[in-house]
Regions:
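N-terminal auxiliary segments of SAM/dcSAM-dependent transferases
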Residues: 1-41
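A short acidic, Gly/Pro-enriched loop at the edge of an enzyme's catalytic core
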Residues: 75, 136-148
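Conserved SAM-binding loop
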Residues: 116
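Conserved SAM/SAH-binding beta-strand->alpha-helix loop
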Residues: 109-111
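A short SAM/SAH-binding and catalytic strip from SAM-dependent methyltransferases
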Residues: 146-157
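Conserved SAM-binding strand-loop segment of SAM-dependent methyltransferases
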Residues: 123-136
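Conserved SAM-binding motif I beta-strand of class I
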Residues: 102-107
Length: 157
């Protein structure tokens, strides 16, 4: 049986592999970098394509819903996304907060943070940032966020 740290490292390794492979490879692999299955990662994935702020490069198909849908995000809010991955939900939240708001994505995988930062840079967003860290010990101060969202991550903690 794996201890907590070994399990955490396994999850980190798998998500790193996902971040580093081509998006088309992600769609046919359920367990990392490689074609081990013809299934998609998540059969419950919602259709983001019509949402404001959607960016296909940030959508790795890893979520299981639309966490911003019921979050009541307002213009000017500061939003934290726990387990932000390549930034998909952050960019949608950024659309809702507008230019006066701020979105902070937190992920514990270096490769996901790098991918998310590259996506934000391509989009020219200056009010979306990505921080590496564990959500159990978030790399943010207290009383920072108006809204917190997470998409299929808390089950991994």
């Amino acid at each position: 049986m794996q201890n907590e740290q070994e399990l955490k490292e396994l999850v980190r390794e798998k998500y790193s592999q996902i971040a580093q492979q081509e998006k088309t490879a992600n769609q046919s692999s359920c367990c990392g970098a490689g074609n081990c299955s013809t299934e998609v990662y998540n059969i419950m994935s919602e259709d983001y394509t019509e949402l404001g702020g959607y960016n296909p490069d940030a959508d790795l198909g890893l979520g299981c819903g639309l966490p911003t849908q019921f979050a009541k995000i307002r213009k000017g809010d500061t939003v934290i996304d726990l387990g932000s991955g390549a930034g998909n939900d952050c960019f949608i939240a950024r659309h809702e907060t507008g230019e006066t708001g701020k979105v902070i994505g937190i992920d514990f995988t270096t490769a996901m943070i790098e991918k998310a930062r590259a996506n934000a840079e391509k989009l020219g967003f200056n009010n979306v940032e990505f921080r590496q860290g564990d959500i159990e010990h978030m790399p943010v101060g207290g009383n920072v966020a108006d809204v917190m969202v997470s998409n299929c991550v808390l089950n991994l903690v």
